[in-house]
Amino acid sequence: MKASMFLALAGLVLLFVVGYASESEEKEFPIELLSKIFAVDVFKGEERGCKGFGDSCTPGKNECCPNHACSNKHKWCKAYLGK
């Protein structure tokens, strides 16, 4: 009887330790995933080689991405509609 109680108690302690270890790993996973998704280096405009919508530009230098044009009035890239 004492052996079975000891074995049951040891099993519960082992289950608690394994559950705690897996829970701590699960808590770190979303943080790592979000830090990789929202990393600042990934979304830099300089890596594209062209400027997107709303980026400042100099008219006549063709700095904007395709389907965008530099506005003479506002000096930022706007969607080019063909006119």
Swiss-Prot record:
Keywords: Amidation, Disulfide bond, Ion channel impairing toxin, Knottin, Neurotoxin, Presynaptic neurotoxin, Secreted, Signal, Toxin, Voltage-gated sodium channel impairing toxin
Residue numbers bearing the Leucine amide modification: L81
One term under GO cellular component: extracellular region
UniProt keyword annotation of Hydrolase present: no
Single GO MF descriptor: toxin activity
Signal keyword on record: yes
Residues passing through the membrane, by range: none
Residues that make up the propeptide removed upon maturation: 22-48
First and last residue of the signal peptide: 1-21
Protein's cellular compartments: Secreted
Tissues and organs where the protein is expressed, per its UniProt entry: Expressed by the venom gland.
Pfam families: Toxin_12
Disulphide bridges: C50-C65, C57-C70, C64-C77
Subunit organization: Monomer.
Family according to the record: Belongs to the neurotoxin 10 (Hwtx-1) family. 15 (Hntx-3) subfamily.
Function per UniProt: Lethal neurotoxin. Selectively blocks tetrodotoxin-sensitive voltage-gated sodium channels (Nav). Does not affect tetrodotoxin-resistant voltage-gated sodium channels or calcium channels.
Domain notes: The presence of a 'disulfide through disulfide knot' structurally defines this protein as a knottin.
Protein name in UniProt: Mu-theraphotoxin-Hhn2o
Species assigned in the record: Cyriopagopus hainanus (Chinese bird spider)
